[in-house]
Amino acid sequence: MSRQNTIADAMSALKNAGDCGKPECILEPSSKLLGAMLRIMQDAGYIGSFDMIDDGRGGQFRVHLSGRINKCGAITPRYSVGLDELEYWETRYLPGKNFGLLILSTSRGVLTHNQARQNGIGGELLGFVY
């Protein structure tokens, strides 16, 4: 059975493992986009370390959880967002001002909504975490 949305599967696996109190979570299949999203979550402190495991099929990420994820999810469809529209999406998906992150795919790579605002660019919404 093929997977339709690997980012949504990974985000729900992270949330479910965090809710159960597990110390780590295995995400498969791996991709560069998912790795970039995990790097952003790690830099913000929502997850601990993670490493890529090459199993000869699709690859896996082993993510060590820190217990700081309240909720995370993928945003589908991937809405195109301009710089002036970021505040609307921030109020729609995040519970409060300066709380949580929107993750965007931009022309300069995968960034948070704060980094995109500082760079003055928009992009496509991938997910959120708080």
From Swiss-Prot:
The keyword Ribonucleoprotein applies. It comes from Methanosphaerula palustris (strain ATCC BAA-1556 / DSM 19958 / E1-9c). Belongs to the universal ribosomal protein uS8 family. InterPro entries: Ribosomal_uS8, Ribosomal_uS8_CS, Ribosomal_uS8_sf. GO terms for biological process: translation. Pfam families: Ribosomal_S8. GO terms for cellular component: ribonucleoprotein complex; ribosome. HAMAP family: Ribosomal_uS8_A. One of the primary rRNA binding proteins, it binds directly to 16S rRNA central domain where it helps coordinate assembly of the platform of the 30S subunit. Keywords: Ribonucleoprotein, Ribosomal protein, RNA-binding, rRNA-binding. The keyword Metal-binding does not apply. This is Small ribosomal subunit protein uS8. Part of the 30S ribosomal subunit. One of its GO terms (molecular function) is rRNA binding.
